[in-house]
Amino acid sequence: MASNKINSLVARNTENAPKSIGPYSQTVAFSHYNNLSAQLPIDPKSGKIVAGGVKEQTEQCFKNIKAILESIDHVMNDVVRITVFVKNIKDVDTVDEVYKTFFPTYVPTRTTVAVAALPLNALVQIEALVSNGEGTIPNAPQAGNLIKLINNTANAPICSLSAQTVSFSHYNNLSAQLPIDPKTGRLITGGVKEQAQQCLKNIKAILNSIDVPFDDIVKINIFLKNLSDIEDVDEVYATFFPDSAIARAVAYVPARTIVAVSDLSMHALVQIEAVVSHGDGTPPQAIEDRHGIVINANNTENAPKNSLSTQTVAFSHYNHISAQLPIDPKTGKMIAGGVKEQAEQCLKNIKAILESISHGMEDVVKVNIFLKNITDSELVDEVYTTFFPGGIPARRTVGVSALQNDALIQIDVVVSNAEGTPLKA
């Protein structure tokens, strides 16, 4: 492959959206996707949170997303997935009213969770993943004529404000699934085990409806009301992954992130989101080309291992890394020290994973930071800038009520994969 045909990271910022409150870009495009930093309800003119309640704040978040998209010649209809973080789950109805005005006809996939804290004491923070049909090969824009495929099936819960699945190019994003029985539209009865099973059943039903195998999932995000329920969820999880005989033969499990939330819609105990490889592509990409792309899953001894998640799962031009806790891979235990030392260990683990697959921190497109104390952001940034001196990747920071191992911080990343994942001869 000629070097001039390789995608490169394109980080961009506009004056029409708030200046980042940390070392990160507003949007980073790579190949067929644009990863936006989570937007806070900041007025770009004043640099402060807008006056008013959750309605005004939601409006401002979406205005900021729209301004970023317009600055890169994109529109709201190019949004593939929206993630809404609220401080209070009761505010979701108000958020929805505003949401409809920005997505009057087409609706992307969506995840909504209530978290313990948001930067600047905001009531809402909204993040968008956006299609990028023109690609990012320097001086060689593609036709930009790829289309999104939107699907809904009656075999999974249907929502008027979100699509169950939106495919674009070689990825498929699913709306986070709640433990809703699609027949009744209500939460199923039972505890967290039954709920986790229903979430995964719903994901399976959505994938079945578009002829995509369950093992094509590359990344799973689990949102838990009580972090102590993780063992029960894991018990159910292990019955779903690996799914096929082929996946079992290689013990394939997707990359994974576990997030403690303060509340979920319908007061569910668990909600699960999936990112899926989509070998068929979307028109005009040819379906038969799928045979040339495979999932590459890797683990290294130099980072903490987990039997229920792979450290890095690459497919096509992206690489998904499991959330890293401040665990020393040599001892398998949490390192000593405060949030700075912990942030450094998380980033060291990420770096070790990337180096094991011949990548580096400069390939990171997006960083997700989960903090026990949102006020630790500045301390984290002191360490963060030593790993990302240019402050290039897009970023999202949320405050969580708890982290596994009583950690103070957890970090996961999305990474560019310029070489793709061709079938090895």
Spans of features found by a protein language model:
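N-terminal presequence-like segments and the immediate start of the first folded domain
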Residues: 1-63, 67-80, 86-201, 205-219, ...
